[in-house]
């Protein structure tokens, strides 16, 4: 028979969990505030793990260096120089972010490049296959699951999750032509994604607990094959 846990033991466990969570926030903040990698240094690190894709690695390196140096400098100013709490600092950091669109064939290393970059920065990384998503209220995953996956990748820490990276795979598959029926896996998903990608305050419902999570500082990398992209461009140019 399992022995019941004493109130003192429960208290010690709660204190330890709080300590671990605070340490996790502190480490993530330290890495972002001290982040000083240049795009050249980031790409050199990626070269050790990702073969080829020179143009893609350069674009991702520039975007990530800009994003986290911007965020790090803003948090340093708010927290270190002005003495603001993390919640206030994240809300007050309003400089615009630039998300990334990566185009390339399946298996060329788009997702892995983003994962390598997230490890170098020291932030959580979540991958989402958009072909499995549908509009809220229908069978399948919906965009709120993206926030939950990011929260899980951050060890349940909402503050750390707000500074993470999300890779949106197969983004080209949710493109839709004009249709007369309700498109729950195309246009419906697009509308939900737009809110997240632009940066918004969101609520994750965990049953007995509700967690607020902003995507204002989450870096989104959208990847797709876009097989007929060249043909689409040619047809549009021909019309013009």
Q: Residue ranges of each PLM-predicted region?
A:
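Non-catalytic accessory segments flanking P-loop/AAA+ NTPase cores
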Residues: 1-240
């Amino acid at each position: 028979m399992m022995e019941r846990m004493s109130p003192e033991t429960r208290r010690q466990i709660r204190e330890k969990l709080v300590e671990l969570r605070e340490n996790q926030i502190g480490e993530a903040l330290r890495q972002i505030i001290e982040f000083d990698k240049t795009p050249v240094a980031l790409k050199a690190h990626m070269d050790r793990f990702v073969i080829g894709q020179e143009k893609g690695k350069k674009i991702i390196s520039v975007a990530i260096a800009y994003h986290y140096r911007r965020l790090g400098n803003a948090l340093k100013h708010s927290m270190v120089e002005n003495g603001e709490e993390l919640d206030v600092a994240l809300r007050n950091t309003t400089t615009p972010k630039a998300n990334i669109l990566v185009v390339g064939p399946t298996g060329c290393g788009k997702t892995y490049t983003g994962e390598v970059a997230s490890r170098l920065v020291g932030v959580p990384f979540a991958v989402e296959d958009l072909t499995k998503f549908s509009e809220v209220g229908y069978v399948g995953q919906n965009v709120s699951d993206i926030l939950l996956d990011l929260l899980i990748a951050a060890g349940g820490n909402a503050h750390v999750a707000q500074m993470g990276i999300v890779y949106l795979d197969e983004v080209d598959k949710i493109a839709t032509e004009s249709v007369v029926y309700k498109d729950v896996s195309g246009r419906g998903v697009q509308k939900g994604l737009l809110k997240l990608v632009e940066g918004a305050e969101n609520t994750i419902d965990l049953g007995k607990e509700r967690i607020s999570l902003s995507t204002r500082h989450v870096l989104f990398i959208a990847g797709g094959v876009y097989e007929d992209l060249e043909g689409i461009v040619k047809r549009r140019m021909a019309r013009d």
